[in-house]
Structure formats: structure tokens, C-alpha cells
From Swiss-Prot:
Its EC number is 5.3.1.1. PANTHER family: TRIOSEPHOSPHATE ISOMERASE. The gene is tpiA. It catalyses: D-glyceraldehyde 3-phosphate = dihydroxyacetone phosphate. Substrate binds at residues 10-12, 178, 218, 239-240. Its main location: cytoplasm. Keywords: Cytoplasm, Gluconeogenesis, Glycolysis, Isomerase. This is Triosephosphate isomerase. GO terms for biological process: gluconeogenesis; glyceraldehyde-3-phosphate biosynthetic process; glycerol catabolic process; glycolytic process.
């Protein structure tokens, strides 16, 4: 089944709203419209930047989309510091990242909470990018495939087959995030293929064939081509490289079959 690649730029806690506008303008200027027929491109800024990004995207009729880095499992109420999926939907958000390794590591999020957040995103018409990935000790022990399969199942628990068909999965080996170490294309394919096989068990073969599985972990313009060429890798969740508008545009073009012309 043909799956349109997705290049998603996770800005993490970087850039104020003025800087966000400048970066989106740079990406839009650097990536001609023709590429958007072959690749979906989204930026995922901090909450405080989303309204500014929305105004720019809508005003200039840009073809890229934008997302959020997290959401609450609650719709509203006395939950100080939380941001509801209902609020994000009103801002025109397309994607929302759930279960990023930094949320799991620094905020104690587990698979059950990730599954609840994925369900909350879907409830409000948002596409969750569900993140899973192993630490270095798990990989070195040779347990990385089973670990990710188990985490996938836990992070999608309670979702129907139809709902699973609406998610994006991001495989992000924790040992490769922000370290400059990159999983080889074969490493990425091994786990992403296992994820797809497990999706067939969780849902069905049609869902498994349609869900996009991304690689995340020090992806950049030099390595993204080989990674997305793998049969079961459908794009990248990009960290640091997404803060460079020209490089992010180049990565998007490569995923579309590039190069950037």
C-alpha cells in the first residue's frame, strides 16, 4: 500500500513566537509547492507559538501543517498547566505528539497515559503521533524489538481498529535522540517492520498497511534519504535539524523523491 511520507519537525522547547514566524517563512520559501504533492510536512512548535503559526499558515495559504507537542487527557476543568485537545483543534492543529521519550523520561509518562492521550487527540479530530523507543541498555541486550512491540501495544490500548488506523507511529531510539548517534537504516527498518507486523495483530492487515511509521533520532539531511527509502519507514520525526529551515526543507524534498531544486 502506498503511504505518503511525513516529515514532522519537533521544535521542542525552542523559539518564541516571533522566531517561529521567521522559521515557517524560511521553510515555505525554501520548499516549492510542487513537493507537497509527494510529502506531508508539519511543524510542531511550543504551545505559545501555535496561534502565530496558524495566522501565518492561514494568511499565506501555506501547504504545510502544524501540530502540538502534547495534550491533556481532559477536555477542560481544574487542571492547571494542561492544554486540552479541544483548544488545539480550535487552533487548526493537525498533529499532536504523545509519549515522546522526553515526556516519558522527565514527566513519568507511561504507556497507559500515552494511550489515554492518543484517545483524547482522536476524540478532537487530531492525529496523534505516538512515540515509542528503547534505551541503549535494552538495545545492547538484544531486547529492542520485543520492547517496542510491547510498548506499542500498551500505547494503543483501548483504541479500536478504526482508531488505530488514524494514528502515526514514531520509532525513536532514545539512545539516538540529540546524541548525534543515528540508528542505521537497517536498524530503523528492523523495528519499523516489527511495528507494522504488530499493528496487523492489534488491528488488521489493512490498517497495518496504511499507518505511517516514522523514524526519530538525530535525523538530518545527510541520513534521511537512506532511512526513508526503507520499506517500512514512512518519514521522520525531526528534532534539532527542524530548527534549520533550509535543512528541514531539504529533508522534506528528499522524502518526496528530491533533491531540492
Amino acid at each position: 500500500m502506498s503511504r505518503k511520507p511525513l516529515i514532522a519537525g519537533n521544535w521542542k522547547m525552542n523559539l518564541n513566537h516571533f522566531e517561529a514566524i521567521a522559521l515557517v517563512q524560511k521553510i515555505a520559501f525554501s520548499l516549492p509547492d510542487k513537493y507537497f504533492d509527494k510529502v506531508d510536512v508539519t511543524v510542531i512548535p511550543p504551545f505559545t507559538d501555535i496561534r502565530s503559526v496558524q495566522t501565518l499558515v492561514d494568511g499565506d495559504k501555506l501547504r504545510l501543517t502544524y501540530g502540538a507537542q502534547d495534550l491533556s487527557v481532559y477536555d477542560s476543568g481544574a487542571y492547571t498547566g494542561e492544554v486540552s485537545g479541544a483548544f488545539l483543534a480550535k487552533l487548526g492543529v493537525t498533529y499532536v505528539v504523545v509519549g515522546h521519550s522526553e515526556r516519558r523520561q522527565y514527566h513519568g509518562e507511561d504507556d497507559a497515559l500515552v494511550a489515554a492521550k492518543a484517545a483524547a487527540a482522536l476524540k478532537h479530530g487530531l492525529t496523534p503521533i505516538v512515540c515509542i523507543g528503547e534505551a541503549l541498555d535494552i538495545r545492547e541486550a538484544g531486547d529492542h524489538v520485543q520492547y517496542n512491540v510491547n510498548s506499542l501495544r500498551g500505547s494503543l490500548a483501548g483504541l479500536s481498529a478504526e482508531q488505530v488506523g488514524k494514528v502515526v507511529i514514531a520509532y525513536e531510539p532514545v539512545w539516538a535522540i540529540g546524541t548525534g548517534r543515528v540508528a542505521s537504516a537497517a536498524d530503523a527498518q528492523e523495528v519499523c517492520a516489527a511495528i507494522r507486523a504488530e499493528l496487523a495483530q492489534i488491528a488488521n492487515a489493512d490498517v497495518a498497511g496504511s499507518v505511517r511509521v516514522l523514524y526519530g533520532g538525530s535525523a538530518n539531511a545527510k541520513n534521511v534519504g537512506e532511512i526513508v527509502a526503507q520499506e517500512d519507514v514512512d518519514g521522520a520525526l525531526v528534532g534539532g535539524a527542524s530548527l534549520d529551515g533550509e535543512q528541514f526543507a531539504q529533508m522534506s524534498a528528499i522524502a518526496a523523491g528530491g533533491p531540492l531544486l
